[in-house]
């Protein structure tokens, strides 16, 4: 019985499993735009990608709310413009992108948003 349970767990996909880990998207996007990945700041926070103009937070689209505050914090500490790359793995995730864009526009937040899939 124990072996059957282990076999079933190994063969079934994990709930909420991502197509690729966040780091996959960070490496691909950041290298394309000549950025530096995993930059540790003086307060020990870690920016996913820093480019010449931006301090960028990467998150899966359903974690949109976290990305806004993190990006603003990184911008404050680095003196760069805040950036967010939302990872969209399902077309339905675009609703989260719209939420972020609406909030940024409504409050005139200095944040740029990109989408990757």
Question: Where is each model-derived feature located?
Answer:
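A general lysine-centric signal
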Residues: 2-3, 80
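Acidic-basic catalytic patches of nuclease active cores, encompassing PD-(D/E)XK
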Residues: 14-52
């Amino acid at each position: 019985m124990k072996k059957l349970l282990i076999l079933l767990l190994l063969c079934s996909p994990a709930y909420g499993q991502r197509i690729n880990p966040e780091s996959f998207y960070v490496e691909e996007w950041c290298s394309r735009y000549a950025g530096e990945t995993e930059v540790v700041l003086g307060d020990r926070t870690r920016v996913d990608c820093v480019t010449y103009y931006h301090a960028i937070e990467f998150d899966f689209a359903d974690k949109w709310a976290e990305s806004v505050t993190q990006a603003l914090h990184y911008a404050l500490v680095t003196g760069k413009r805040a950036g967010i790359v939302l990872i969209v793995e399902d077309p339905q995730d675009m609703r989260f992108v719209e939420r972020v864009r609406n909030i940024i526009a409504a409050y005139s937040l200095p944040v740029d948003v990109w989408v990757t899939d």
